[in-house]
């Protein structure tokens, strides 16, 4: 009897381990059913940040801007009162320096002509007016600019004056009319250079003479 029961149990166990496709399919179906029970979540829809619409009231108009003339940002020059007790001025056309008449023995057209010759600038004198040949500028940024200067000496009973004005101005060989800013700069630069060079040379002569006397 026990043997019969044991055989029956063995048969049931073997039946559970059967490789029958139908049996396996039933097992797989039960697994799929358990998988469908897993919940699925959809993305959370949020309203986000609502930005205000752009207001065109202060928008810049979309227009084509034409380039204007180049602006000269270099600092201007003025005539300097290098001579003792002198007065300087730019009158819109000329730079001038007025000084005591006794100083005219140093600051005069003859000295100016000699100085220009040393710089390689030729000139002609007609009475109290000296006219230079074309002279290149030494201003940084200038391109092929040349100037003809007119230098005049004016004398009264008490004072003497030197004035510098622009007679002609050209760039790359083409003559053009300088504006007031150019006139002020270039006439002041030329007058200051003349007076400073003559003053420096005169002071050097005095120092050399003083050294000779001491020895």
From Swiss-Prot:
Disulfide bonds: none
Superkingdom of the organism of origin: Bacteria
Localization annotation: Cell outer membrane
Residues in coiled coil: none
Signal peptide: 1-16
One Pfam family cited in the UniProt record for this chain: Lipoprotein_18
Annotated keywords: Cell outer membrane, Lipoprotein, Membrane, Palmitate, Signal
Lipid-anchored residues (S-diacylglycerol cysteine): 17
Residues covalently joined to lipid (N-palmitoyl cysteine): 17
InterPro entries registered for this protein in UniProt: NlpB/DapX
Membrane topology designation: Lipid-anchor
GO cellular component, one term: cell outer membrane
Family the entry assigns: Belongs to the BamC family.
Name of the protein: Outer membrane protein assembly factor BamC homolog
């Amino acid at each position: 009897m026990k043997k019969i029961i044991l055989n029956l149990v063995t048969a049931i166990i073997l039946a559970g381990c059967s490789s029958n496709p139908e049996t396996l399919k039933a097992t797989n179906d039960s697994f799929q059913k358990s998988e469908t029970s897993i919940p699925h979540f959809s993305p959370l829809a949020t309203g986000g940040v609502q930005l205000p619409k752009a207001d065109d009231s202060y928008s810049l108009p979309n227009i084509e801007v034409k380039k204007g003339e180049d602006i000269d940002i270099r600092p201007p020059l003025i005539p300097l009162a290098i001579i003792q007790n002198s007065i300087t001025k730019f009158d819109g056309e000329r730079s001038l320096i007025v000084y005591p008449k006794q100083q005219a023995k140093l600051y005069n057209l003859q000295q100016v002509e000699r100085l220009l010759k040393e710089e390689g600038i030729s000139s002609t004198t007609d009475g109290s007016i000296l006219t230079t040949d074309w002279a290149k500028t030494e201003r940084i940024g200038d391109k092929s600019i040349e100037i003809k200067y007119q230098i005049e000496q004016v004398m009264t009973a008490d004072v003497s004056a030197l004035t510098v004005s622009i007679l002609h101005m050209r760039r790359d060989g083409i003559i053009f009319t300088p504006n007031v800013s150019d006139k002020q700069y270039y006439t002041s630069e030329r007058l200051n250079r003349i007076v400073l060079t003559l003053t420096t040379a005169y002071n050097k002569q005095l120092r050399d003479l003083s050294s000779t006397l001491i020895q």
